[in-house]
């Protein structure tokens, strides 16, 4: 277990985690103008001018290893509207909580500006297979038919959360991976926020002398600590950060730190309690 440098992960890591979860995202594309456009098979077709911008939903975002470039899954019709040579676009990702009673709450916003490009159909299928090894997702099953993979060459990243607005350099995103517990966080929030589980109320006593009127909510778990939402008797809500004594790298270490925050022993007698 390595020492904890700060109470929260770095901005680039928080942004990387939000992109991997991709709870709710849209891609803002400029409307096509009259002329021709490229298609995923390399041919060209005539287009009619239209007004307004297209904002297709993004079903998945995957960062290419070692770079800040992103592969995005969007509807085929919207991908076909991207001209040859690409077009500047904006990806907006709402990092919504995916588990527990706070499901659907937005905790941060990630905005990525860059050049979005088409990928030919054959390369899309190969890329989808490669992505599935790292990020299995049902959104990849439709690639090549009702959905398409496009590439976003990242130029600028903005992260907005409780810490304020942070401008993240593409190189920082390229060298930062998501939190190691990103994929499982939603399941743990479901379990730990269960009314039958008393772990969250015990943690809440570390930041308030008595329990608030409403049951405290665990709204975030990462390698560096947990986030709680507390509501007082007047209905005012506030968020509290409880950092771990040491950063976690695997599930066993995370279970240890969660128990210590709740006032438990480092090594429980019940082996089942080793799990978060």
Segments from the language model and where they lie:
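Binding-site signature for planar aromatic cofactors or substrates
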Residues: 1-276
